[in-house]
From Swiss-Prot:
Residues 314-324 have a biased composition (Polar residues). The lineage of its organism: Eukaryota, Viridiplantae, Streptophyta, Embryophyta, Tracheophyta. Keywords: Nucleus, Transcription, Transcription regulation. It comes from Arabidopsis thaliana (Mouse-ear cress). This is L10-interacting MYB domain-containing protein. Residues 162-225 form the Myb-like domain. Its main location: nucleus. InterPro entries: LIMYB (IPR045026), Myb/SANT-like_dom (IPR024752).
Length: 449
C-alpha cells in the first residue's frame, strides 16, 4: 500500500505554481491537464520537493483544489454575501453568514480569510462555472443530517473524509493559531505529560473555533496534534544526525548532496526539509519540551515501559519516521482503519491514562543507554547551564540588568526545563515575550533542579 500524500503548505505552493505553468503552456485543454501536462508536473514536483508522490496523488490534490474552488466561487457569487473584490472582503451581516453557513457549512473556512494564491487559482479555474441555486440562499436547510450521521462524521479520520471540515482544513494561519494555543496551554501547565489534559483541550477547541469559525471537533484537534508531533519528530531526528551537519546559528545544513541523498534514501519523509526548516521551530521546541528533543529518537513512555518489563536487556527499536503534519488538506487514501497513518492502540497514549514523564524518566534513560547511538546523542546534547542562560540574557539589550524582568528570569533559570525553553528560543524578541508572559501570569518561582 502506497503512503498517503500529505500536503503541507510548501508542497501545495510548488504544485500550484507548476499547474499555473502548464496552464499557460496550453497543457490544460479543459478542466484537467493533458498527459504531457501531468508528466511535466510530476517530474518537476518530485525534483523540487523530494517527495515521491505519484500521478494519482497529484490528481487527488487537484480534485480537492477544484472542490474548494467551487465552494469559494459559490460563496462570492451569492449576491447577499456582498463580496467586494477590491478590498477582498465580504460585507455580509452576521445573520447573512449564519444563514449561508447553515446551508453551506464548508464555506466557514472563508469567513475570516480568502483562499491562498487567489490570483493563481483564478488562472487555473478560469471558465469553470459554478451554479448558484436560488434555494441555496433561503437560510433554511432542507435536509438535516441525523444525529447518528453527525456523530459518525465526527469520529471519522480527517484524512479519509471527503468533507473538508471533517477532514480538517489547516491553512498556515490556522496552524499557526493552533501552535500559539498549544504554547499557551503548555506554559499554563495543561500538558502534564505527553498530551494535554481535558482543560487544555477544552480551551484550545473553544478558542480556535471562536477565531476561525470552522467548527473543529476535539478528535480533529487531537489528530492534528499527532501529525504535528510526527513532523517535529522527523525534524529532530534530522538535525540530530551528525552527517547532516545542522548549524543552529545559521539555521542551515552543511551536508553534501551525496549525504542528503543517502539520508533521504533511508529516511524518505525527511525530504520535505531538504530546502527549508520545519515551520515555527521555536514554538514546537516549547510544545514538545521533554517529549521529543532534537537529536533524540522518541519512544512513547507506554511502549518503553512494556519493553522494559518484557526484556530489561533489550535495546529499544528505533522506528521509522512517520507522516508530516497536515498543514493544508490531506487527500483521501486511507491507511489501516481510519487513514492518516493512524497510530496503533499501543502507540497512542491517552492523556488521562499516560504515565507521567517523571515516573518514566529512569526507564527511558536505561533504554537509551542500551542503544548503539546513545553515545552520539549524549555528546551532542546541550548542557543548558545557568551560566549559559545568563550569558544569553545579558546579550539582550532590551532587558536591563537588575530590572524586574531580569531578576524574574534569573529565578526561572533555577529549573532546567525553563533553561531549555529559554535557550531553544533563538530570537531575542521571542525570549522577551516568553518571559513577559510568565511574569504577567504571576508564575510561581521554581525550586532548584
Amino acid at each position: 500500500m502506497r503512503p498517503k500524500a500529505v500536503w503541507e503548505p510548501e508542497y501545495h505552493r510548488v504544485f500550484v505554481d507548476l499547474c499555473v505553468e502548464q496552464t499557460m503552456l496550453g497543457n490544460k485543454p479543459g478542466t484537467h491537464f493533458s498527459k504531457e501536462g501531468w508528466r511535466n508536473i510530476l517530474i518537476s514536483f518530485q525534483e523540487q520537493t523530494g517527495a515521491m508522490y505519484d500521478r494519482m496523488q497529484l490528481k487527488n490534490h487537484w480534485d480537492t483544489m477544484s472542490r474548494q474552488w467551487k465552494i469559494w466561487r459559490r460563496l462570492v457569487e451569492t449576491s447577499f454575501m456582498n463580496w467586494n473584490p477590491e478590498s477582498n472582503r465580504f460585507r455580509a451581516t452576521d445573520d447573512d453568514w449564519a444563514n449561508y453557513l447553515q446551508e453551506n457549512p464548508d464555506a466557514g473556512q472563508y469567513r475570516l480569510s480568502v483562499p491562498h494564491d487567489l490570483k493563481k487559482l483564478e488562472i487555473l479555474f478560469a471558465g469553470c462555472n459554478v451554479e448558484v441555486k436560488n434555494d441555496e440562499v433561503s437560510g433554511v436547510r432542507k435536509r438535516r443530517r441525523s444525529c447518528y450521521e453527525e456523530e459518525d462524521e465526527d469520529n471519522q479520520s480527517m484524512c479519509s473524509s471527503s468533507n473538508p471540515q471533517t477532514k480538517g482544513y489547516w491553512s498556515p494561519s490556522t496552524h499557526k493559531l493552533f501552535l500559539d494555543l498549544l504554547v499557551q496551554e503548555t506554559l499554563k501547565g495543561n500538558r502534564p505529560d505527553t498530551h494535554f489534559n481535558k482543560e487544555g483541550w477544552k480551551t484550545i477547541l473553544g478558542t480556535i473555533n471562536e477565531n476561525t469559525g470552522l467548527g473543529y471537533t476535539r478528535p480533529q484537534l487531537k489528530n492534528h496534534w499527532d501529525c504535528t508531533r510526527k513532523a517535529w519528530k522527523i525534524w529532530c531526528q534530522l538535525v540530530g544526525a551528525s552527517s547532516m551537519k545542522w548549524d543552529p546559528e545559521s539555521r542551515s545544513f552543511g551536508a553534501t548532496e551525496e549525504e542528503w541523498r543517502i539520508y533521504i534514501r533511508e529516511n524518505p519523509r525527511a525530504g520535505q526539509f531538504r530546502h527549508k526548516e520545519v515551520p515555527h521551530a521555536d514554538q514546537l521546541a516549547i510544545i514538545f519540551n521533554g517529549v521529543i528533543e532534537p537529536g533524540e529518537t522518541y519512544t512513547p513512555p507506554s511502549r518503553s515501559r512494556k519493553k522494559l518489563l518484557h526484556n530489561r536487556s533489550e535495546s529499544p527499536q528505533w522506528r521509522d519516521t512517520t507522516p508530516l503534519s497536515k498543514m493544508h488538506v490531506d487527500e483521501a487514501e486511507t491507511s489501516r482503519q481510519n487513514g492518516c497513518y493512524a497510530e496503533s492502540q499501543e502507540d497512542r497514549i491517552d492523556s488521562e491514562n499516560a504515565q507521567p514523564l517523571d515516573d518514566m524518566k529512569l526507564m527511558n534513560d536505561v533504554m537509551l543507554q542500551e542503544s548503539p547511538v546513545f553515545v552520539e546523542i549524549e555528546s551532542a546534547k546541550p548542557m543548558y547551564s545557568i551560566g549559559e542562560c545568563i550569558k544569553s540574557l545579558n546579550a539582550i539589550e532590551e532587558v536591563e540588568q537588575g530590572s524586574e524582568l531580569y531578576m524574574f528570569a534569573l529565578d526561572l533559570f533555577l529549573k532546567r526545563e525553563y533553561r531549555e525553553i529559554f535557550l531553544e528560543l533563538k530570537k531575542p524578541s521571542l525570549r522577551i515575550a516568553w518571559l513577559q508572559r510568565l511574569q504577567s501570569t504571576s508564575f510561581p518561582i521554581p525550586t532548584t533542579t
